[in-house]
Amino acid sequence: MAPKNHQKYTIKNDIQHVLDCSDVYIGDTAPTARSEWMFDDAVNQIVWRPTTTPEALVRIFVEVLTNAVDNIERSINGGHELCKNIKVDVDLKTGKTSVWNDGQVIPVVKNCDNGVVQPPPPTTEQDRLAYEKLNREYIHTIIFGHFRTSSNYDNETDQVSGKNGVGVKCTNIFSSWFSVVGVDPDRKLKFSQEWRSNMTKSGAPQVVKCALKTGYTLVEYVPDFARFKLKSYPEDVESIFKKLVVDASAFFPNTAFFFNGERTVVKNAVAYAKLYYNLNETAVDSVVIDYKDSKVVVVGSATPLPPVSFVNGQITPAGGQHVTNWSRVIFGALLAALNGKKNVSLTKADIAPYFQLFIHSKVSKPKFDGQNKNCLKSPKVEAHLDATILKKMLKWKIISTIQDKVVKSKEYLALKKIECRRTPIVKVDGYDQANRLGPDSVLIVCEGLSAKSYAVAGIQKGLFNKKGRTYFGILPLRGKFLNVKNTTPLKIGQNKVVSDFIKVLNLKFNLDYRKATNYATLNYGTLLILTDADKDGIHIKGLILNLIHELFPTLFHRQGFIYSMETPIVKILHKKGQPTLFYDENSFEDWRAQHPELKHFKYYKGLGTIGPADVAAFFGSKVVRYHYDEATDAAVNSVFKDENANERKEWLGRFNPRVSQWCLDHHREAVIDLKISDFMHHEMIKFSYEDCRRSLASCIDGFKESQRKIIYAVRKKFRSNSTEFIKVAQLSGYVAEQTDYKHGEQNLCETIVKFAQDFVGANNVQLLEPDGQFGTRLEGGKDSAAPRYIYTKPHKILPYIFREEDDPILEQSSEGEPVHFVPIIPLVLVNGSVGIGTGWSCFVPQYNPLELIRYIEARLTSQDSEALLPAKPWYRNFTGKVAATGPGKFTTFGRMKQVDADTVRVTELPVGMWTDRFKDQCYSLIESGQLQQLVNESTVSKVDFTLKKLQDISALKLTTTLHTTNMVLFDRENVITKYDTIGDILDHYFQTRLAFYKVRKNHTIAQLKNTIQHNETKLKFIEKVLTDHSFLRQDDAAIVSILEKENFLKVDNSYNYLLNISIRSCTATAVEKLQSTIKGLTESLIRVQQTPTRQMWYDELQQLKQVGNWSEP
């Protein structure tokens, strides 16, 4: 059907078509709000900022700049003068914009004289006339003033930015004035021509002679601002244009680029990439990939940016084939590596925001999506990532960020599986659910089943104006509570203790509990933590607070949600009145020092030791309410995050265990408010310190806490009889009974066994004697028999190292155990020490006891002791070699000899390599074809391997390394100290032991004097009885009166020790014996008084050497 209205059809010329359809050629001419990359001179970086500068105004500049940049490649490929300079100038006031370049020049000739064979003339008269006119035009005129003309039409033309024959003509069309100047040094001519009014008016070409030896092309124009709805250039144009010049200078380093007279220097592609990042930001990781015709810079940064890409020097904002292929290769390799290590599947979308790609590809005959050339359509760009570059990238800091943020966020999604719907009954082992669930109910989380019994008894008394099972639920923790900051969500979900805790409270991940509606979904509105009053109890509180901080942080903002119930550690019993309770060990020790008469007190080792009678008095008497403050986040992270280890070292180094920064005993109120940050700094540090006490040895006695408890109990048990063996299992039970040890008797058994081991690499000096299989060098002691089958007793050397004379003056803890022993040789160097504590670890190698004794003897006799410092570690019965191989570094070598051309025999292994491990290593070499045969003739104590046709001796790994760079020990004040050399350790030990002898000497003199006086008084009393027969016929009061008048010595303010003397003690024989005793004591007193302390130590060392019977090093 014909249209009702006639439609008008018009034919537009090329110029009018471009002007009317600008979006087809150069984009929108109207000012529109968008964001654009710009160069900010103030901070010397590329920034992403909003702008209203028309897209088309930028495009017409790009067309001119691209022509100049294309000249770089043309000059190289054409064998012409290289393009050395490109100069851009922009006048914001007048709008005049110019681009100047040298290199390959446009010849100043007419098209017909260009030397190029022209196509046959058109057949129509009109086309023939146009053809002849074009042939009479200069080449400059054709390129810049005629549509669909371009040298790039030539299919042989390679790496340039396009070949539509439009390009720079668009600049001319959208300019009120346009000019081109060209110098041809070969023809010694200079060409110039101007156009006006959107290329509709052109001036005649001007050609003059020119003697310049360097040719150039200069394009200048003034935009037709009216067509862009502007009066002049916007202010940010300069920043936008300069950024485009900087782009080009980055990828063509052999050409100097200038913008408004100033050179834009970008050293390389990496320097260009870093222009996109804040200079104040921590230095980012980067790598450059050069592959075929592409140069790619990959930057690892948490600042998400889209890929920045170029083709032949021209920016491609929408990317294209080159971006797609490089992204696929780079992110594909990263994903394969990351997903291979994790239990979650990452995608490109997960990791791409953490990597910035800068891609520049030189592409032959590129095809774009349009004249704007925003996106490369073809050809396909090849991409490849070398394995060494991938390995480097996997070590970047940003990988840890991805693992922390992206991987964990995905893993936390998996954690949601442990959430449970709110059901009437939550089934968890040992859990007693409150009869009413909701915000008014209280969940008591306690430490094990024994603590549960305390809680069940206590809720009958009640707390928070509630009592009984109506509002109280009880969850006993049955297992290890994880530090959730240093583990994967997968492991968190697999931990039954944590998952039970989450289920019972009905906690939901990513829920904001600051909102009342979300808070009301919890099964309990209050969490009450009930643990033992020891350091492990503090640790459990900290772990629960850490879990909430990491997984449910908004609960910290619910004031009054988290409480802990405290119980006393000591109860003082008085004859009259109420008992005194202490919740802090230091405050108890202070009080005890002021009350030396204290005899009766009860020490509570845990909730299980609190009897039913005490529950009513203790339950709820001290409750701590935890508060979030601005320092909480940093405090929790500093205590629990692995990366804060160095911070914890400083933290522990400042800690004084004898001073409580926060003390419950200073608070009389029932509910005490405590900031979580204060709990971390003042309470958690007690556990961290205690953890180090368990893991790190003392510089003075060489013992960790459990080792010290064992020796204390052994000396106590075998004081009267050291000849009978005892089962290791029985001894561990005795140690646990006699000391304040709470960590399982199995650990004690292992430590007892190690004290008695005598194979190479174990003890240089055994402290316990073995009877049974205590382990061999076959498995490094792991092959010992079960503790119930093996026996031990003190080694004969034990009393010579730990002198009985020392016992009365050893500093004791509140449990009556030594804070540390003071052996007569530095055991920490004799037997070495290895341990890992909170923030600290330690390794001290072993040294020959004879060498250490010689050093001490030299210091005692004021000889040159420095020369006698042990030069290297020493291990008893080790027949290999120990050599210094660097500062603080020693290497131990096994022994091997060549039997014949095909056979070697190994007769010693390096320290720390066990026989069976070496055997397994050799079998692996046989399986891999590096060894033909192994003959094993080793015994439990000797190494003997014969190897046939070994290809590479180094594969045996017959060396181990010992270091003296991490000798971290407790000093005499129990402060964690890192010792740089064994000389430092020896000096600290020597000063301590020598001072100890002075104290011991004074104590011994006082004790001898007291004993002599006591015996002399007894002798005087006996002699009085024997000479005054009427003396005992009087009553007690008269006798006491006489004794007082005659100044008889009282003991404990009485004369009972005299009045209770038996008749047998009053015989002449007894008197003679007592006189002999007094004489012996007096001689001992004189001997002690006359013996210098240094001589005392020296003499005891001689006794030790005789018993030790050690071999020379």
From Swiss-Prot:
Domain Toprim: 441-563
Residues holding ATP: 67, 101, 150-152, 162-169, 371-373
Cofactor binding note: Binds two Mg(2+) per subunit. The magnesium ions form salt bridges with both the protein and the DNA. Can also accept other divalent metal cations, such as Mn(2+) or Ca(2+).
UniProt keyword annotations, A-Z: ATP-binding, DNA-binding, Isomerase, Magnesium, Metal-binding, Nucleotide-binding, Topoisomerase
SUPFAM superfamilies for the chain: ATPase domain of HSP90 chaperone/DNA topoisomerase II/histidine kinase, Ribosomal protein S5 domain 2-like, Type II DNA topoisomerase
Domain of life the protein comes from: Viruses
Active site (catalytic residues): 789 (o-(5'-phospho-dna)-tyrosine intermediate)
One GO BP: sister chromatid segregation
Catalyzed chemical reaction(s): ATP-dependent breakage, passage and rejoining of double-stranded DNA
E.C. designation(s): 5.6.2.2
Signal peptide extent: none
UniProt cross-references to InterPro entries, sorted A to Z: DNA_Topoisomerase_II, HATPase_C_sf, Ribosomal_Su5_D2-typ_SF, Ribsml_uS5_D2-typ_fold_subgr, Topo_IIA, Topo_IIA-like_dom_sf, Topo_IIA_A/C_ab, Topo_IIA_A_a_sf
Site (Transition state stabilizer): 788
Entry cofactors: Mg(2+); Mn(2+); Ca(2+)
GO MF term (any one): metal ion binding
Residue ranges constituting the Topo IIA-type catalytic domain according to the UniProt record: 696-1101
Keyword Glycosyltransferase in record: no
Pfam families to which the protein is assigned, alphabetical: DNA_gyraseB, DNA_topoisoIV, Toprim, TOPRIM_C
Residues annotated as binding Mg(2+) 1: 447, 532
Family (UniProt): Belongs to the type II topoisomerase family.
Protein name, entry field: DNA topoisomerase 2
